[in-house]
């Protein structure tokens, strides 16, 4: 179908922004529909995965419940056998484990029934719960028969438990078959959902390809072709050719670009004419400026020579004043260092005094503790005397018991062995008591020697403290004298520094004036050179303007 003239005019005036808006809107709608479809498919898949997971959990709950129920009955049987063998403690543990397993299996069955919402599972789950209650009752009867040690009652309830377990196994098989069929049904539904999603994705892909082709055709016809034409105009303008006029194309963004390009071409033509006029005026002004700058440069050179002589004289005076200031500052610094050393010595003496006092107090405390230790050692010796007396009496009693056992003959042999062991223990206790008494005697002697040594250390520490206090008083006098010397040196250094500062300020001002004079001379020289360069640039500018084709 060939587009009519009105249609072509409409496309020429169609805003690129509007066209791109429609294209992007179609793409956005396609993307939105694709996203919604994918979201719907994902929700369906999530539901199916959840159902499969619940089905698997139901099978696990059912199998674990039956396994724990079987283990509960097995523990009761083991407990019954152990109780018959006289192992009551082990049988009790078996009974407790059976109760725990029965409670866990009951919880799993209740959870299975609660989650069995399908009609096909609901009836079987209810029957399973009732049958499990019968089985739990039979196992409880086994535990009761075990506690009563009734073999007849145990075999009776054991038969009931076996029958209930048989029905539970049959129900488990039916439930597992039903759950498996439900899982297969979910997988078939998932396959059908996947096929629908794939077909929908292919359709959306076809729509996207068609939209992409239409978008490319619009961009190639309404954007790329006009931009190539505009690029040709830009290349000609960049090369200096302004002779080819720019024609407008429509009222859209590309048309506005061509209108602005036309305005730029005309503006460059006007600018080139103005530049040509300005170049002639600059040539005349540069000649006059060159003469004025030559005269200014000569005057500034003479002024710089006179300032150089004045700056040299002030620099020599500044050097002398700074030497005086440095000597005063050096003296002040030396005095300050002496003051710091004196202060440091005073602090160290103060720390020595505090340390000596603390050491004296600690030695006195240690001496008191050692005195307490001596008393405690004496108390321990008294306790050991009592223990030794008790062991001697125990030895005598064991000897009497051995004699009585010997009189009893064969009937008292076991008692004689015990009496002999008691006598041996009493003998060992007596020997250990003697060894401890010897060690306590050594500790007591060492402690008394330590107390005497502590007392001597206390006396020496007190003497050291008195000497340190006297040294601190002497250092305090030295510190005060150094402080007065430091204050006087600071006054001298401050006065010398003020004089040096004034001299430096004068020297700096003269140097600044000389620097400004040099800068002015250099500026005049640069201005002269710039005026000459400006004359050359005027010629070059005229030549450049001549290169353009208007």
Swiss-Prot record:
Residues bound to L-quinate: 71-78, 135, 142, 158
GO CC term (a single one): plasma membrane
Spans annotated as Ligand-binding domain: 44-196
Domain of life of the organism encoding this protein: Bacteria
Gene Ontology biological process terms, A to Z: chemotaxis; signal transduction
CDD domains: HAMP, MCP_signal
Residue ranges of every copy of the Methyl-accepting transducer domain listed in the record: 278-514
Cell compartment(s), UniProt: Cell inner membrane
Regions of this protein lying in the Cytoplasmic compartment: 1-19, 220-550
Bilayer-spanning residue ranges: 20-40, 199-219
Recorded topology in the membrane: Multi-pass membrane protein
One function term, GO molecular function aspect: transmembrane signaling receptor activity
HAMP domain: residues covered: 221-273
Family: Belongs to the methyl-accepting chemotaxis (MCP) protein family.
Protein name: Methyl-accepting chemotaxis protein PcaY
Species of provenance: Pseudomonas putida (strain ATCC 47054 / DSM 6125 / CFBP 8728 / NCIMB 11950 / KT2440)
């Amino acid at each position: 179908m060939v587009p009519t003239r009105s249609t072509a005019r409409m496309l020429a005036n169609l805003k690129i922004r509007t066209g791109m808006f429609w294209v992007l809107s179609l793409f956005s709608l396609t993307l939105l529909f694709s996203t919604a479809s994918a979201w719907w498919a994902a929700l369906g898949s999530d539901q199916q995965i959840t159902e499969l997971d619940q089905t698997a959990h139901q099978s696990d709950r059912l199998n674990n419940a039956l396994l724990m129920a079987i283990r509960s009955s097995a523990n009761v049987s083991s407990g019954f056998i152990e109780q018959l063998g006289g192992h009551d403690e082990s049988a009790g543990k078996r009974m407790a484990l059976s109760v725990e397993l029965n409670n866990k299996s009951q919880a799993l069955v209740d959870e299975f029934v609660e989650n069995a919402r399908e009609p096909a599972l609901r009836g079987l789950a209810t029957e399973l719960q009732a049958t499990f209650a019968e089985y739990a009752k039979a196992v409880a009867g086994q535990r009761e028969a075990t506690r009563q040690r009734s073999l007849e009652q145990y075999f009776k309830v054991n038969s009931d438990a076996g029958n209930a377990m048989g029905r539970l196994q049959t129900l488990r098989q039916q439930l597992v078959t039903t759950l498996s069929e439900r899982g297969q049904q979910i997988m078939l539904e998932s396959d059908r959902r996947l096929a629908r999603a794939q077909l929908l994705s292919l359709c959306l892909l076809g729509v996207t390809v068609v939209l992409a082709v239409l978008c490319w055709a619009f961009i190639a016809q309404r954007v790329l072709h006009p931009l190539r034409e505009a690029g040709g105009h830009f290349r000609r303008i960049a090369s200096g050719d302004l002779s080819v006029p720019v024609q407008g194309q429509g009222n859209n963004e590309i048309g506005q670009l061509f209108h602005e390009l036309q305005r730029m071409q005309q503006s460059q033509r006007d600018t080139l004419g103005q530049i040509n006029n300005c170049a002639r005026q600059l040539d005349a002004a540069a000649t006059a400026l060159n003469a004025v700058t030559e005269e200014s440069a000569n005057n500034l050179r003479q002024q710089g020579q006179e300032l150089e002589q004045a700056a040299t004289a002030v620099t020599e005076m500044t050097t002398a004043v700074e030497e005086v200031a440095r000597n005063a500052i050096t003296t002040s610094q030396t005095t300050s260092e002496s003051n710091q050393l004196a202060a440091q010595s005073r602090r160290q003496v103060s720390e020595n005094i505090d340390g000596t006092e603390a050491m004296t107090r600690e030695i006195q405390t240690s001496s008191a503790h050692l005195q307490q230790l001596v008393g405690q050692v004496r108390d321990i010796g008294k306790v050991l005397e009592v223990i030794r007396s008790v062991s001697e009496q125990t030895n005598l009693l064991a000897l009497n018991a051995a004699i009585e056992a010997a009189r009893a003959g064969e009937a008292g042999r076991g008692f004689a062995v015990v009496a002999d062991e008691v006598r041996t223990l009493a003998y060992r206790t007596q020997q250990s008591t003697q060894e401890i008494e010897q060690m306590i005697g050594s500790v007591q002697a060492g402690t008394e020697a330590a107390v005497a040594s502590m007392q001597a250390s206390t006396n020496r520490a007190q003497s050291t403290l008195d000497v340190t206090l006297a040294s601190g008083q002497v250092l305090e006098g030295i510190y005060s004298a150094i402080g007065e010397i430091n204050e006087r040196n600071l006054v001298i250094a401050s006065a010398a520094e003020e004089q040096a500062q004034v001299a430096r300020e004068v020297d700096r001002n003269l140097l600044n004036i000389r620097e400004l004079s040099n800068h002015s001379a250099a500026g005049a020289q640069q201005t002269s050179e710039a005026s000459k360069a400006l004359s050359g640039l005027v010629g070059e500018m005229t030549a450049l303007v001549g290169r353009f084709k208007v």
